Protein backbone atom coordinates (compact mmCIF):
# COMPACT_ATOMS: atom_id res chain seq x y z
CA UNK A 1 0.00 0.00 0.00
CA UNK A 2 1.35 3.36 -1.05
CA UNK A 3 1.46 6.32 1.29
CA UNK A 4 0.16 9.18 -0.87
CA UNK A 5 0.87 11.76 1.85
CA UNK A 6 4.53 10.81 1.95
CA UNK A 7 4.84 10.92 -1.84
CA UNK A 8 3.11 14.31 -1.98
CA UNK A 9 5.39 15.62 0.75
CA UNK A 10 8.50 14.45 -1.09
CA UNK A 11 7.28 16.01 -4.34
CA UNK A 12 6.67 19.34 -2.57
CA UNK A 13 10.07 19.13 -0.88
CA UNK A 14 11.75 18.51 -4.24
CA UNK A 15 9.90 21.40 -5.88
CA UNK A 16 10.85 23.65 -2.95
CA UNK A 17 14.52 22.69 -3.21
CA UNK A 18 14.58 23.29 -6.97
CA UNK A 19 12.91 26.69 -6.56
CA UNK A 20 15.31 27.64 -3.76
CA UNK A 21 18.33 26.68 -5.83
CA UNK A 22 17.02 28.59 -8.85
CA UNK A 23 16.40 31.67 -6.71
CA UNK A 24 19.93 31.46 -5.31
CA UNK A 25 21.42 31.23 -8.79
CA UNK A 26 19.39 34.21 -10.05
CA UNK A 27 20.35 36.23 -6.96
CA UNK A 28 24.02 35.33 -7.44
CA UNK A 29 24.00 36.80 -10.93
CA UNK A 30 21.72 39.81 -10.34
CA UNK A 31 22.91 41.05 -6.92
CA UNK A 32 26.10 42.71 -8.25
CA UNK A 33 24.16 44.48 -11.02
CA UNK A 34 21.51 45.68 -8.55
CA UNK A 35 24.23 47.04 -6.24
CA UNK A 36 25.95 48.71 -9.21
CA UNK A 37 22.72 50.49 -10.20
CA UNK A 38 22.02 51.54 -6.59
CA UNK A 39 25.57 52.89 -6.24
CA UNK A 40 25.26 54.79 -9.54
CA UNK A 41 22.10 56.48 -8.27
CA UNK A 42 23.77 57.41 -4.98
CA UNK A 43 26.93 58.74 -6.66
CA UNK A 44 24.83 60.76 -9.10
CA UNK A 45 23.09 62.31 -6.09
CA UNK A 46 26.46 62.91 -4.39
CA UNK A 47 27.63 64.70 -7.53
CA UNK A 48 24.66 67.06 -7.11
CA UNK A 49 25.95 67.95 -3.62
CA UNK A 50 29.71 68.24 -4.21
CA UNK A 51 32.29 68.15 -7.00
CA UNK A 52 33.55 64.64 -6.33
CA UNK A 53 36.94 65.24 -8.01
CA UNK A 54 37.83 67.74 -5.26
CA UNK A 55 37.61 65.19 -2.44
CA UNK A 56 38.97 61.90 -1.22
CA UNK A 57 35.81 59.92 -0.51
CA UNK A 58 35.65 56.94 1.80
CA UNK A 59 32.66 54.83 2.72
CA UNK A 60 31.61 53.33 6.04
CA UNK A 61 28.76 50.88 6.51
CA UNK A 62 26.16 52.21 8.89
CA UNK A 63 24.05 50.27 11.36
CA UNK A 64 20.35 50.29 12.09
CA UNK A 65 18.61 52.96 10.03
CA UNK A 66 21.92 54.17 8.59
CA UNK A 67 23.15 52.75 5.30
CA UNK A 68 26.39 53.80 3.65
CA UNK A 69 28.07 56.87 5.13
CA UNK A 70 30.25 58.84 2.70
CA UNK A 71 33.13 60.81 4.22
CA UNK A 72 34.48 63.73 2.18
CA UNK A 73 38.02 64.88 2.92
CA UNK A 74 39.86 67.59 1.07
CA UNK A 75 42.30 65.90 -1.32
CA UNK A 76 45.55 64.97 0.44
CA UNK A 77 44.38 65.86 3.96
CA UNK A 78 42.77 64.07 6.87
CA UNK A 79 40.35 66.92 7.56
CA UNK A 80 36.71 65.92 7.17
CA UNK A 81 34.92 68.57 5.12
CA UNK A 82 31.55 66.86 4.93
CA UNK A 83 29.70 63.65 5.65
CA UNK A 84 26.83 62.34 3.56
CA UNK A 85 24.52 59.91 5.31
CA UNK A 86 22.23 57.33 3.78
CA UNK A 87 19.44 57.13 6.33
CA UNK A 88 16.00 55.49 6.44
CA UNK A 89 12.79 56.06 8.37
CA UNK A 90 9.30 54.59 8.24
CA UNK A 91 6.82 56.64 6.23
CA UNK A 92 3.30 55.77 5.16
CA UNK A 93 4.32 52.70 3.15
CA UNK A 94 4.52 49.55 5.25
CA UNK A 95 6.73 47.76 2.75
CA UNK A 96 9.58 50.24 2.23
CA UNK A 97 11.11 52.96 4.36
CA UNK A 98 11.84 56.43 3.01
CA UNK A 99 15.58 56.56 2.24
CA UNK A 100 17.47 59.83 2.02
CA UNK A 101 20.95 61.14 1.38
CA UNK A 102 21.69 64.03 3.74
CA UNK A 103 24.89 66.02 3.14
CA UNK A 104 26.25 67.85 6.18
CA UNK A 105 29.30 70.13 6.13
CA UNK A 106 31.81 70.15 8.98
CA UNK A 107 30.23 73.36 10.36
CA UNK A 108 26.90 71.42 10.70
CA UNK A 109 25.25 73.28 7.84
CA UNK A 110 23.15 71.10 5.58
CA UNK A 111 24.59 71.23 2.07
CA UNK A 112 21.63 69.43 0.54
CA UNK A 113 19.41 66.39 0.84
CA UNK A 114 17.62 64.08 -1.51
CA UNK A 115 15.10 61.27 -1.19
CA UNK A 116 16.64 58.36 -3.10
CA UNK A 117 14.08 55.66 -2.40
CA UNK A 118 10.44 55.62 -1.35
CA UNK A 119 7.16 53.91 -2.08
CA UNK A 120 4.79 56.47 -0.68
CA UNK A 121 1.29 56.95 -2.05
CA UNK A 122 1.28 58.47 -5.54
CA UNK A 123 -0.24 61.93 -5.53
CA UNK A 124 0.35 62.40 -1.82
CA UNK A 125 3.54 61.31 -0.05
CA UNK A 126 5.46 60.65 -3.25
CA UNK A 127 4.90 64.23 -4.40
CA UNK A 128 6.73 65.84 -1.48
CA UNK A 129 10.09 64.15 -1.97
CA UNK A 130 11.48 67.20 -3.79
CA UNK A 131 10.01 69.59 -1.24
CA UNK A 132 12.23 72.13 0.54
CA UNK A 133 11.89 71.23 4.22
CA UNK A 134 13.75 74.37 5.33
CA UNK A 135 16.61 72.59 7.12
CA UNK A 136 19.82 74.60 6.96
CA UNK A 137 21.57 73.48 10.17
CA UNK A 138 21.39 69.81 11.11
CA UNK A 139 21.11 70.31 14.87
CA UNK A 140 18.28 72.87 14.61
CA UNK A 141 15.06 71.50 13.17
CA UNK A 142 12.87 74.25 14.64
CA UNK A 143 12.17 75.58 11.15
CA UNK A 144 11.34 72.17 9.66
CA UNK A 145 8.58 72.75 7.14
CA UNK A 146 6.38 69.67 6.99
CA UNK A 147 3.67 69.27 4.39
CA UNK A 148 0.05 69.05 5.49
CA UNK A 149 -1.88 66.01 4.37
CA UNK A 150 1.17 63.76 4.30
CA UNK A 151 2.03 63.66 7.97
CA UNK A 152 3.63 60.21 8.03
CA UNK A 153 5.94 60.95 5.11
CA UNK A 154 6.87 64.36 6.57
CA UNK A 155 7.56 62.71 9.92
CA UNK A 156 9.76 60.09 8.23
CA UNK A 157 11.82 62.81 6.59
CA UNK A 158 12.09 64.73 9.87
CA UNK A 159 13.16 61.50 11.59
CA UNK A 160 15.95 61.12 9.03
CA UNK A 161 17.22 64.62 9.85
CA UNK A 162 16.90 63.93 13.58
CA UNK A 163 18.92 60.70 13.33
CA UNK A 164 21.70 62.48 11.45
CA UNK A 165 21.62 65.41 13.90
CA UNK A 166 22.04 63.03 16.84
CA UNK A 167 25.03 61.35 15.22
CA UNK A 168 27.00 64.02 13.36
CA UNK A 169 28.94 65.56 16.27
CA UNK A 170 30.34 62.17 17.25
CA UNK A 171 31.29 61.33 13.66
CA UNK A 172 33.07 64.64 13.09
CA UNK A 173 34.87 64.20 16.39
CA UNK A 174 36.43 60.90 15.32
CA UNK A 175 33.55 58.52 16.01
CA UNK A 176 33.72 56.96 12.53
CA UNK A 177 35.80 53.84 12.00
CA UNK A 178 37.12 54.12 8.45
PLM regions: where:
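Flexible, solvent-exposed loop/hinge segments and secondary-structure transition points
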Residues: 2-178
